[in-house]
Design a protein with these regions (language model features):
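Extracellular S/T/G-rich loop segment that most often corresponds to the catalytic His/Ser-adjacent loop
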Residues: 264-266, 272, 431-516, 520
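Primarily auto-inhibitory N-terminal propeptides
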Residues: 102-220
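Subtilisin-like serine protease catalytic core
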Residues: 129, 241-346, 357, 371, ...
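Beta-strand/beta-sandwich contexts
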Residues: 26-62, 103-131
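Protease zymogen maturation seam
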Residues: 117-132, 191-259, 267, 271-273, ...
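Substrate-binding/access-modulating region of protease and related hydrolase catalytic domains
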Residues: 337-436, 489-505
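C-terminal subdomain of the subtilisin-like protease fold in secreted/lumenal serine endopeptidases
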Residues: 12-15, 361-363, 440-441, 518-592
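Surface-exposed, short loops/turns at beta-strand junctions within beta-sandwich domains
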Residues: 87-92
Length: 592
């Protein structure tokens, strides 16, 4: 063989050998992006769910529910979609995931609850007179409680040529698809439906999903360290106290994991903060477990809200509060669930399912303003607006939800963001849901670090009111409003996001830890402990009507040992996560 040919052969073999040492390109990870009820929602003998996933392999894939593999004959496949059908009496709510060759997808929560509503497609919406996007042919009927809801809804559907397509059965609420082509026809039919005997209200859905309760635009907050903001609520002090100071028998023992529902769309499991949840997770092993659909970006709203509770970060200062308690408490389950993109109606449907699945806490980082709402300066609020007719329907739906909650689940606490319109949070004509007066709704405002004052963390001037935060007597407590978004690069810190959306999960996390210590706490007792333990914010004592610098209901003498001369009396309340845990431990000795 000529020398040149021999050299080329040797070079070729060397290249092949080198290439063989490199692993084959890894397959894209499987990510579940959607899971919802489908088929006949009212079937009695079987229930079906439709699952959509990215990078679903062409070969066989295994589906697991509650840790057990689902039989192949219960699955149907169509491209990147799977349909799961189970006998009604065999369904148990729990985590669901896909596996292929030992690799797992993100776990999502499958609810056995029967509440499910449909979202409108792009060609099923229109602009109304207020220039707001509204559903054309999908509305929901709230049936009066002395009627059988489904039977009445079907009667009305037959009468009007409509079809029942969704439901929130515990609230006697049913979604109809109307035989209309435009808003004029819809409004005429809505008026007729609203006057029918047995119909309490008609809910019109406006715009898309509402969970972006955050400020818009980038500001100087990008330089604001997250840990400094959380220090204002003694975040790390609370973690240390829980792990080191609370006896093991008081934070674990025979107690069950605490289940928390977050009404959000999705979480990006490609972000390092959430990658650990792609591995098997058992809350009974004193772990925090996270279940959610997968998002496309790590800086989405759901990832930021869920991360405050459940992020796993190499820097302890960026660790989620509940995940920082791993190995010490009874375990926590954080369920990110949205039902569908059918706006406020879907928020309520998801909340009902989560409560029926055992959630003790609901995190509602969302809210809406009525058109015409003005802020504390008298300027119009221009975000998250809804028309008067839509607000009326939402108010009725939320009222039914809280009545049901008080009647059937009095131990559940809803924690809601006050809003970012710099408006009054408690005016029921202009703001929902924070304006509701019920012991089972805790409203959270936002504060930020006051860099102009060099004072101790306990001092009222350590923080100041976040300018955009909604205010007034209906706000129960405040917490840090700014957090850093997750990123795909573990060595890179994300942008700062601010809003009462991110103050809310700080309170939800504190309440979750409190309930893990004393599961017997009732919602009014939780509120009492949070306000008794609170640090303060704001000016001197002022019991006058809320003004621009009044953030929460003023601290009362009864919340300070009935001392009229206590310096905290009359000031606004600021979350103290450590002190709240201390008082919770004391509550075990002083059961009411």
């Amino acid at each position: 063989m000529p020398a040149r040919a021999c050299a080329l052969l040797t070079l070729g073999l060397g290249l092949l050998s080198a290439l063989a040492t490199f692993p084959a390109a890894a397959e894209d990870p499987i990510r579940i992006t959607q899971l919802k009820r489908c088929g006949d929602l009212f079937a009695e003998d079987s229930l079906s769910w439709c699952l959509s996933a990215k990078a679903l392999p062409r070969g066989e894939v295994q589906l697991y529910l509650n840790g057990e593999r689902v039989a192949a004959d219960e699955l149907q496949r169509d491209g990147e979609q799977l349909r799961l059908t189970l006998a009604a009496d065999a369904v148990r709510s729990g985590p669901l995931w896909l596996e292929r060759d030992g690799l797992r997808s993100n776990p999502v929560w499958l609810s056995a609850g029967r509440s499910q509503v449909l979202a409108a497609k792009p060609d099923e919406v229109a602009r109304n007179m207020d220039d707001l996007t509204t559903y054309v042919d999908l509305v929901s009927l709230i049936i009066e409680e002395d009627h059988k809801g489904l039977e009445k809804a079907r009667q009305l559907a037959e009468k009007y040529g409509a079809k029942v397509v969704g439901a929130i059965p515990p609230l006697n609420t049913y979604q109809l698809r109307l035989p209309v082509k435009d808003l004029t026809e819809r409004d005429a039919m809505v008026l007729r439906l609203g006057s029918e005997v047995g119909v309490d209200a008609v809910v019109i859905e406006e715009s898309a999903a509402e969970n972006d309760e955050q400020e818009t635009g980038k500001t100087a907050d990008q330089k604001r360290p997250q840990n400094r903001e959380w220090a204002a609520n003694r975040f790390l002090d609370a973690v240390d106290y829980y792990r080191e100071r609370i006896p093991a028998g008081q934070r674990a023992g025979e107690k069950q994991p605490v289940r928390i529902g977050i009404i959000e769309r999705a979480v990006d499991f490609d972000a390092p903060h959430f990658a650990e949840y792609l591995e098997p997770c058992d809350p009974q092993q004193q772990r925090t477990c996270l279940y959610a659909r997968d998002a496309d970006r790590p800086d989405n709203h759901g990832s930021s809200v869920a991360g405050i509770l459940a992020a796993h970060a190499s820097d302890a200062r960026d660790q989620g509060f509940l995940s920082a308690l791993d190995g010490t408490g009874p375990g926590f389950e954080v369920i990110v669930e949205r039902n569908s993109d059918a706006g406020i109606t879907a928020n309520v449907a998801a909340s009902v399912n989560l409560v029926e699945d055992g959630a003790r806490i609901l995190n509602w980082s969302w809210g809406i303003h009525r058109i015409g709402t003005v802020d504390v300066e008298g300027e119009p609020v221009d975000s998250l607006l809804r028309s008067g007719i839509a607000m009326s329907g939402y108010e009725e739906l939320l009222e039914e939800f809280f009545l049901w909650l008080r009647r059937e689940h009095p131990d559940v606490l809803v924690i809601n963001s006050a809003g970012n319109g710099s408006a009054h949070s408690g005016r029921d004509d202009y703001r929902l849901p924070s304006s509701f007066i019920t012991e089972q709704l805790l409203v959270v405002g936002g504060h930020e670090r006051n860099d102009q004052e060099k004072v101790a963390v306990e001092h009222p001037d350590y923080v100041r009111k976040r300018k955009s935060s909604n205010v007034d007597m209906r706000v129960d407590i405040t917490a840090a409003a700014c957090t850093r978004a997750a990123t795909l690069d573990p060595d890179k810190r994300g942008d700062v996001h601010c809003g009462t959306s991110y103050a809310t999960p700080l309170v939800a996390g504190a309440v979750g830890a409190m309930l893990s210590v004393n599961p017997g706490l009732e919602p009014d007792q939780v509120r009492e402990l949070l306000r008794r333990s609170a640090m303060t914010i704001g000016r001197d004592s002022d019991f006058e009507p809320a003004e621009a610098d009044d953030l929460t209901a003023p601290i009362l003498p009864s919340e300070r040992g009935y001392r009229l001369d206590d310096r905290d009396v009359g000031r606004s309340a600021r979350l103290d996560m450590r002190k709240a845990l201390e008082l919770t431990v004391e509550s075990l000795k002083n059961s009411r």
